[in-house]
Amino acid sequence: MAAREESTQSANRVLRISQLDALELNKALEQLVWSQFTQCFHGFKPGLLARFEPEVKAFLWLFLWRFTIYSKNATVGQSVLNIQYKNDSSPNPVYQPPSKNQKLLYAVCTIGGRWLEERCYDLFRNRHLASFGKAKQCMNFVVGLLKLGELMNFLIFLQKGKFATLTERLLGIHSVFCKPQSMREVGFEYMNRELLWHGFAEFLVFLLPLINIQKLKAKLSSWCIPLTSTAGSDSTLGSSGKECALCGEWPTMPHTIGCEHVFCYYCVKSSFLFDMYFTCPKCGTEVHSVQPLKSGIEMSEVNAL
């Protein structure tokens, strides 16, 4: 029976990363609340909140504490991750929420401690210089001890996975799941699908620059736009000059490349600049030189139309 309870507790134990994520979410929420609160005072006199910043922060954190830990036994970050605080000092194995005294002490240690850390030097500034120096040394010594205690607590937390902060260890509260967690089955179908799609996308990014889109487009257009003259007829430059061999329209500034077909100047020049091995899509003739069509032949064709 005891072995079964131990296995159940180990299966429902909150992961270390989940507890640390909850702390990071709490810090992010506090920064967001404070930034949104300061936005309300942009139109006021500069430095208005500077004098009362520790007190205003303490009031905001107290407001958050009232509607999170005091009422729901969990911080905002813990609620997101489906965990909450449990009274570790209770001998009953059934879930026991933190007592009211523990919640109040939690507020004193977290909210009051941060307020005292920001206000301690201001409280002793008006004192005598010697007493201020002694108070400063004492405060530095206490802060150093707390930092050392937090470091030792964090090392123990990494080893045992319990009490993520020094405050939790001193008050005897630790994180547990809100509901019993069942064993999760990890499936790799989604990951495999994402890896395949990413690999296919990288392959396309590597392959597409190697494809001559302009040449492929010209080849397809040559299949779609048939020759106006038949194979048996005498194909002359005038009979084939009624349309551009690339775009199929009446040639604008007609030019030739050494074969019997006519091109728009823009079509043939852009294709030749894009591909130095450009060939005529109709007959496959290589570009020797781009020459304008003789005006006499062009005018005769216009008159024939």
Curated annotation (Swiss-Prot):
What domain of life does the native source organism fall in? Eukaryota
Q: Which GO terms describe its molecular function?
A: ubiquitin protein ligase activity; zinc ion binding
Residues binding Zn(2+) 2 are 259, 261, 280, 283
The cellular location(s) given in this protein's UniProt record come to: Peroxisome membrane
Entry binding sites for Zn(2+) 1 = 244, 247, 264, 267
The residue spans the entry assigns to the Cytoplasmic side of the membrane are as follows: 43-48, 126-133, 212-305
Principal location listed in the UniProt entry: membrane
Checking PROSITE patterns in the record gives: ZF_RING_1 (PS00518), ZF_RING_2 (PS50089)
Q: Name one GO cellular component term.
A: Cdc73/Paf1 complex
InterPro entries named among the record's database cross-references = PEX2/10, Pex_N, RING-HC_PEX2, Znf_RING, Znf_RING/FYVE/PHD, Znf_RING_CS
Task: Indicate the enzyme's highest-level EC class.
Answer: transferase
Q: What is its EC number?
A: 2.3.2.27, 2.3.2.36
Pathway named in the protein's UniProt entry:
Protein modification; protein ubiquitination
Report the sequence similarity comment from the record: Belongs to the pex2/pex10/pex12 family.
The role this protein plays is:
E3 ubiquitin-protein ligase component of a retrotranslocation channel required for peroxisome organization by mediating export of the PEX5 receptor from peroxisomes to the cytosol, thereby promoting PEX5 recycling. The retrotranslocation channel is composed of PEX2, PEX10 and PEX12; each subunit contributing transmembrane segments that coassemble into an open channel that specifically allows the passage of PEX5 through the peroxisomal membrane. PEX2 also regulates peroxisome organization by acting as a E3 ubiquitin-protein ligase.
On assembly, the entry states: Component of the PEX2-PEX10-PEX12 retrotranslocation channel, composed of PEX2, PEX10 and PEX12.
Identification of the protein by name = Peroxisome biogenesis factor 2
* Gene name linked to the record: Pex2
